[in-house]
Every structure is written in structure tokens, then in C-alpha cells.
Curated annotation (Swiss-Prot):
<keyword id="KW-0614">Plasmid</keyword>
<keyword id="KW-0546">Nucleotide metabolism</keyword>
<feature type="site" description="Important for substrate specificity">
    <location>
        <position position="151"/>
    </location>
</feature>
<comment type="function">
    <text>Nucleoside triphosphate pyrophosphatase that hydrolyzes dTTP and UTP. May have a dual role in cell division arrest and in preventing the incorporation of modified nucleotides into cellular nucleic acids.</text>
</comment>
<feature type="active site" description="Proton acceptor">
    <location>
        <position position="68"/>
    </location>
</feature>
<dbReference type="Pfam" id="PF02545">
    <property type="entry name" value="Maf"/>
</dbReference>
<feature type="site" description="Important for substrate specificity">
    <location>
        <position position="69"/>
    </location>
</feature>
<feature type="site" description="Important for substrate specificity">
    <location>
        <position position="11"/>
    </location>
</feature>
<dbReference type="GO" id="GO:0036218">
    <property type="term" value="F:dTTP diphosphatase activity"/>
</dbReference>
<dbReference type="GO" id="GO:0009117">
    <property type="term" value="P:nucleotide metabolic process"/>
</dbReference>
<dbReference type="GO" id="GO:0005737">
    <property type="term" value="C:cytoplasm"/>
</dbReference>
<dbReference type="InterPro" id="IPR029001">
    <property type="entry name" value="ITPase-like_fam"/>
</dbReference>
<keyword id="KW-0378">Hydrolase</keyword>
<protein>
    <recommendedName>
        <fullName>dTTP/UTP pyrophosphatase</fullName>
        <ecNumber>3.6.1.9</ecNumber>
    </recommendedName>
</protein>
<keyword id="KW-0963">Cytoplasm</keyword>
<dbReference type="InterPro" id="IPR003697">
    <property type="entry name" value="Maf-like"/>
</dbReference>
<comment type="similarity">
    <text>Belongs to the Maf family. YhdE subfamily.</text>
</comment>
Length: 193
């Protein structure tokens, strides 16, 4: 049985390492992540994660783990910004407000799929022009849902969260561990030999 991480995210790889898990292979799927018309944010996140898990090629005995993280303000899905201008637009919309971060994680083995969605609340402080421009200049917004990463410089902009910190980063560890154990992955195998 091979364990395949269906994600190119270095953050997910680092989070898996906290569980003592090293993927045998990394195969980021290439799927269309465009929200469907009228699709609710949690449904969108779950669908994209499921499609990612189904898109990764694997052998029948392999385990494939995929996840998707979505930043949501009201019903607005904030994906990865195309450029600094869109990142600024996202951050200004989030400034001084609470929003949701939804992370869906899926584990597939053959035709079996285990999936869990985790919804966390995040409050971003009211950003001054100086803070916004300084953060944009770091480039840390690139490739990040909502235009920020809580585990980087943007952590200074987040005074409050409710939920799972690791889910906000990109992979809810408690839920991921449960999925791995449910699928028979030897998560806490004896390493003292």
C-alpha cells in the first residue's frame, strides 16, 4: 500500500510530517476549481476535494489524500488571487471582519472515499494602508486562498480564531488522523525497534 498526497502544497506536506506521515509519492491533480453557478461555499469545497481525490491516478491498494481550503466572506468564495491587485481587494474586504475558512479533506482507497469538512472562524484586524502594502510586498499572499496565510506574516493580522488552526493552514490534523486510521493506515505504528 502506497500513501499518495494529492497536493503540491508544502504546508500540507509539513502538517502530515507532524503526524509522522511521509507520502510515498506526491501527485497534485489538475482539475477545474471554478465554482458552479449558485454553489454554496461548503458544497464547493467538498466537491473540489472529492474531484481532486478522484483525479489522482493510483493502484487499487493505494491511499490518496487530498484537501482544499476555501476562504469565505458571507457567501463569497475567495480563491487564490490572480495578482497583487486582487489580493489587496480580498484583504480589504476581510479587513476588520470575521470570515470562515473551510477545509475539506478526503481519503480514497479504490472506490471508497472518506471525507470530512472543517469550518473555522477567523477575524482579521482592521488593516491600515501601511499594513496592507507591507503585507502585499512580502509576496506571502501568492497561491493562498483569500490572499493570506495565517502561519506566515499575516499571522500578525489575525487576532482571533475559533476552530482548527491546522485546518486554516490547509490540513485539519485531528480529522486527517481519524480518516487515516479508519482506512487502516498504520498511523501510530511502533517505531522503537
Amino acid at each position: 500500500m502506497a500513501f499518495i498526497l494529492g497536493s503540491g502544497s508544502p504546508r500540507r506536506l509539513e502538517l502530515l510530517a507532524q503526524l509522522g506521515v511521509t507520502p510515498d509519492d506526491i501527485r497534485p491533480p489538475d482539475i477545474d476549481e471554478t465554482p458552479q453557478k449558485g454553489e454554496l461555499p461548503r458544497d464547493y469545497c467538498a466537491r473540489v476535494t472529492r474531484q481532486k481525490a478522484e483525479a489522482v491516478t493510483s493502484n487499487p491498494e493505494d491511499l490518496v489524500l487530498c484537501a482544499d481550503t476555501t476562504v469565505v466572506l458571507g457567501r463569497r468564495i475567495m480563491g487564490k488571487p490572480r495578482d497583487a491587485g486582487e489580493a489587496a481587494e480580498f484583504l480589504l474586504a476581510l479587513s476588520g471582519r470575521r470570515h470562515r475558512v473551510i477545509t475539506s479533506v478526503a481519503l480514497r482507497k479504490q472506490d471508497r472515499l472518506w471525507q470530512k469538512d472543517v469550518v473555522s472562524q477567523v477575524k482579521m484586524k482592521r488593516l491600515s494602508d501601511e499594513e496592507l502594502n507591507a503585507y502585499l510586498a512580502t509576496g506571502d499572499w501568492e497561491g493562498k486562498a483569500g490572499g493570506y496565510a495565517i502561519q506566515g506574516p499575516a499571522g500578525a493580522l489575525i487576532p482571533w480564531i475559533s476552530g482548527s488552526f491546522t485546518a486554516i493552514v490547509g490540513l485539519p490534523l485531528a480529522e486527517t488522523a481519524t480518516l487515516l486510521q479508519t482506512a487502516g493506515y498504520p498511523l501510530y505504528k511502533d517505531t522503537a525497534s
